[in-house]
């Protein structure tokens, strides 16, 4: 590159950086495009890829995210971003902007899953039996990317952005602990996102209202009378009883639920004897149940108890059911605020065009982001990463799950754009001035 061209490039980049927000006060639609351009810079992209790979190599389960939190704090320190830690055991809460109202929050989850990674690549998990199989490494990276974009334009922010690096989304209800910690008081809105292997790279998706199901867990112990497998007549077989229970539980959805009222019951664990010739005294089964509507969720919960105890009794066994709520509360449905969804859609279309926005149907997965939405207006969305020219990607929670790192600039710039535009829209409204 010639000296003149180099000078011209530097001047253009300086102008883009210096007027990213101030110029956009006259043309808000340019903010997402400008942030995306900055996030796609080679140096910025390489920085995000490096962070994501470091997190991926060292996965930590819920409330164990010690090293992940250290990485987050180190990067925030480099940016000059202030933060609180620990919050909700291992969480980190960062602050960018004026320190005064209005306040808007951005959230990323940090925890991994107890899964052995089966993808062979240079940055495979170094921790046996643990893997980032749901993209939380990418979520954390994208929020750090958003923090960097926002910090570079902090003087132009019309309020304060709260960066929520949350622990324990995978069953630990870390969001609930964040809310209970009181760090989101006076926050006007919170935004979160999730990677999607079903959407094309550069596509964004969400919907107004009901987005994801409420979910709960159950564990049932079915007790009979143990004995020799060759002499079943002298035993009361809890394995057979549990098998009948599992089949009967499937009738709750196929024969009792309205087909237009989506529900799911899945038995995912079955534990009995370790010996091939022993009928055990008891069997333990466990699983998840989900529903989009709170009323249906409660009805399903009641029927699970009835079916398990009654079917056990028919087979001359006893049964107890535990919904494990002392360990983890059930997750409410994820419901997007109507006003925030319209706002999100406008920002998404401004960034990538209407052709890259997809209005999704409700899905039966669940998210503890719903706990934020119970406390303050919130919006959750999906960022696509599927390369249409390649074979379909593995689903989340698979040992073969992979993240297309090309999506990182899209998520980082979307989060930064949502926060910036929200503060600009809210700066003229009355707000409480302290967190």
UniProtKB/Swiss-Prot annotation:
Annotated signal peptide: 1-25
Query: What Gene3D superfamilies does the annotation carry?
Result: 3.30.70.360, Zn peptidases
Q: Does the keyword Hydrolase apply?
A: yes
Q: Which PROSITE patterns match?
A: ER_TARGET (PS00014)
- What general EC class does the enzyme of this chain belong to? hydrolase
Matching entries from Pfam families are given as:
M20_dimer, Peptidase_M20
Out of the domains of life, which is the source?
Eukaryota
**GO cellular component terms listed in the entry, alphabetical order:** endoplasmic reticulum lumen; nucleus
Q: Which UniProt keywords apply?
A: Endoplasmic reticulum, Hydrolase, Manganese, Metal-binding, Signal
Residues given in the record as Mn(2+) 1 binding sites: 134, 170, 397
* One function term, GO molecular function aspect: metal ion binding
Family stated for the protein in its record: Belongs to the peptidase M20 family.
This protein is called what? IAA-amino acid hydrolase ILR1-like 5
Origin species, per record, is: Arabidopsis thaliana
- Record gene name: ILL5
């Amino acid at each position: 590159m010639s000296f003149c061209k180099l000078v011209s490039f530097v001047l253009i980049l300086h102008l883009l950086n210096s007027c990213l927000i101030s110029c956009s006060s006259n043309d808000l639609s340019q903010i997402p495009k400008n942030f995306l351009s900055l996030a796609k810079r080679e140096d910025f992209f390489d920085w995000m890829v490096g962070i994501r790979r470091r997190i991926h190599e060292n996965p930590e389960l819920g409330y164990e995210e010690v090293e992940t939190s250290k990485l987050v704090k180190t990067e925030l320190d480099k940016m000059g971003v202030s933060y609180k830690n620990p919050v909700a055991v291992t969480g980190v809460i960062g602050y960018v902007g004026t320190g005064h109202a209005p306040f808007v929050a951005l959230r990323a989850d940090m925890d991994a899953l107890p899964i052995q990674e089966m993808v062979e690549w240079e940055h495979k998990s170094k921790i046996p039996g643990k893997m980032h199989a749901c993209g939380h490494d990418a979520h954390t990276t994208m929020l750090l990317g958003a923090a960097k974009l926002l910090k570079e334009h902090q003087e132009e922010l019309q309020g304060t952005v709260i960066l929520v690096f949350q622990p324990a989304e995978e069953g630990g209800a870390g969001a609930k602990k964040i809310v209970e910690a009181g760090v989101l008081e006076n926050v006007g809105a919170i935004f979160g996102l999730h990677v999607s292997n079903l959407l094309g790279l550069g596509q964004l998706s969400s919907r107004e209202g009901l987005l994801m199901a409420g979910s709960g867990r159950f564990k049932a112990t079915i007790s009979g009378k143990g004995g020799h497998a060759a002499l079943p007549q002298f035993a009361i077989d809890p394995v057979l009883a549990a098998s009948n229970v599992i089949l009967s539980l499937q009738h709750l959805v196929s024969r009792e639920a309205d087909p237009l009222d989506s529900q799911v019951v899945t038995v995912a664990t079955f534990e009995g004897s370790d010996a091939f010739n022993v009928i055990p005294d008891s069997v333990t089964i466990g699983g998840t149940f989900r529903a989009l509507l709170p009323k249906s969720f409660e009805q399903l919960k009641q029927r699970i108890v009835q079916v398990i105890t009654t079917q056990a009794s028919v087979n001359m066994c006893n049964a107890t059911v535990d919904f494990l709520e002392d360990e983890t509360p059930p997750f409410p449905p994820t419901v997007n605020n109507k006003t925030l969804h319209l706002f999100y859609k406008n920002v998404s279309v401004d960034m990538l065009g209407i052709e890259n926005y997809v209005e999704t149907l409700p899905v039966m997965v669940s998210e503890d982001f719903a706990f934020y939405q119970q406390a303050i207006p919130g919006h959750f969305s999906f960022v696509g990463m599927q390369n249409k020219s390649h074979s379909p990607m593995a689903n989340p929670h698979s040992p073969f799950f992979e993240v297309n790192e090309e999506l990182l600039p899209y998520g980082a710039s979307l989060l930064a754009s949502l926060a910036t535009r929200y503060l600009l829209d809210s700066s003229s409204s009355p707000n409480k001035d302290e967190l």
